[in-house]
Swiss-Prot record:
It catalyses: a ubiquinone + NADH + 5 H(+)(in) = a ubiquinol + NAD(+) + 4 H(+)(out). It comes from the Eukaryota. The lineage of its organism: Eukaryota, Metazoa, Ecdysozoa, Arthropoda, Crustacea. One of its GO terms (cellular component) is mitochondrial membrane. This is NADH-ubiquinone oxidoreductase chain 4L. One of its GO terms (molecular function) is NADH dehydrogenase (ubiquinone) activity.
């Protein structure tokens, strides 16, 4: 029950946070971590698949961080509304 509540809360934050890129990226990382915990607790993943999943997740986080840094360097803020200008 707690996992489904966390999933719905993560989806709500991800869908409603469209003003700041940092909040969107953090909620996306929360959803991926929740998906990982669901797959591990349901014994759906073997250990090697778990490490591959975590490696891809770390790469996704690094790419999101690099996009955030380049956005802040170019516009001075992490607000998504500056992308339209």
């Amino acid at each position: 029950m707690m996992i489904y509540l966390s999933l719905s809360l993560g989806l709500l934050i991800f869908s409603s946070s469209n003003k700041h890129l940092l909040v969107t990226l953090l909620s996306l990382e929360f959803l991926i971590l929740l998906l990982f915990s669901l797959l591990v607790y349901s014994n759906y993943m073997s250990m090697i698949n778990a490490f591959i999943f975590l490696s891809v997740t770390v790469c996704e986080g690094a790419l999101g961080f690099s996009v955030l840094v380049s956005l802040v360097r170019s516009s001075g803020s992490d607000q998504v509304q500056f992308l339209n200008e």
